[in-house]
Structure formats: C-alpha cells, structure tokens
C-alpha cells in the first residue's frame, strides 16, 4: 500500500479498510471500476451512497495543497459504474487561480478515462461556486447528483438555480461529448503524437484554442492534460493543471518532470502558452516546448 493512504485507512470502517487495502498498490491513482466497487460494497455491507462518502478520505490523500494545507477529495461516478477520485492542487508561490479544485480533478480524471456521462459527484463539503459552474458544463450537468455528508442528495440544479451554461452560448455538445478536432503534424516523436491525440479531444468551443499538455518523467512515463473551457470562462481548466493533477494522482513528484510539451491550434483566439509556462516553472526547472499546429 502507498504510504500516502496510511492516515486515510485509519478513518475507514474496519471491513472497508480491510477490503480496499489490496487496491491501494503502487499503481493506484484513484480509479475503482464497477466490479471492484461492488466487491467493496459487499465486503463493507454499506449502502452505495454510504460507501462513496466513506471513500472520500482516500480521495483526499491525493491532494497537494502547499498553500492552504487543506486536503479536499472528490469522487465522480460515471454512467459505466466506475468511480474516479480527484483532489485539490495548489502551485507554490503562484496566484490562486492556478489551483485545481477537487471536483475539477475528479471530473478530468473521468474525462481522460473515456467517460461520456457523469451521474454523481461525491464531496465532503458543498461545492463552491467555481465548481458548480464547472459541473454545469458537463453533458446533462444540471442533472448530476451531488452527494454530501448529512444532507439529502440533490441535483446540481438545486445548488445552481437559473444556471448560465453552454446552451446560453449556443453550444450543443458540452464537456464530455465526443470531441474530435483534426490536428496533424509530421512527427515520429511519441510525446508529440500523444499530445496531438489529446489536443484533438480537448474542449474549447468558445475560443477554438484546442490544446493539450504532455509531461514526461525521467523514467519515460507520460502524463497528459487537455484544455476544458467553461461558459463562464474563469472556471476553465488549463491543460497544464490537468496534466499536473494527473501526475499527482499517480503519486509522482513534479521534480521528476524532464520534458514538457504544449500543443495548441493556430486558430484559437487565445494562447495558453503563458499560463502553461507559469504553472510549469512553479514546480519544475524545465523549458516548455510550444508547438502550434494548423487544424485541418
């Protein structure tokens, strides 16, 4: 079991703790599939909602909050039945807008894993306005059920009435819809090829700044992030932050980064290079490779 979960395990009911320990091996990064979840439910004899709330300390152990020292975990449950954990991240010395909220982390985890619909968000405190707006960008976002301790489950529309969202800006394929922009570049570099794939799947209906980030560690592992825009603009999730969140979930130190690539479309009305460089340089002494691609 990874050391970062030692304190969290102590907070779980004993039957659940015993059942989940085998999952928390060196490769665990916050994903529990539907079959594993069913096995945890059977072993713990807990109702599903009770079980998901009980797992929040495990999600919170994924957090990296050097500024606030406040660990927040969230869980997104997809239509597949799989659950995806996420946690907050803060970048040392950088402005707070560089932070990743736990709900953003969990949703991006599900998105990167191929989920097309998120049905439930489980979190230990009421989602802030920023996160409510981010959830509202999803396919059927207003219908996403929010689960909180000691409160009745309610859809996002209860927490964000009279919401402003993608439909108000004539966007008919919101976040988690299948996106496929064709971005090509003649390259045999595996990192660039991976980045092109993710940039093509990014979500940027408002600026057309389709983009992705790929981070490589010294052992050759890669971690990706895609741009995820928001109708309210400010809650948009940057690809660098998503990639760093992915690294954190996989228990990798940012000091292990030895290469970083940002790929973005030439047709975007904005560029993400400045924001990506600031975020990267707060955690790693690595130059950002910036590649601008003509979309087909």
From Swiss-Prot:
A Pfam family hit: dCMP_cyt_deam_1
Hydrolase is among the record's keywords: yes
EC numbers: 3.5.4.5
Cofactor(s) recorded in Swiss-Prot or TrEMBL: Zn(2+)
A Gene Ontology cellular-component term: cytosol
Subunit structure: Homodimer.
PANTHER family according to UniProt: CYTIDINE DEAMINASE (PTHR11644:SF2)
Protein name stated in the entry: Cytidine deaminase
Organism the protein comes from: Shewanella pealeana (strain ATCC 700345 / ANG-SQ1)
Gene name linked to the record: cdd
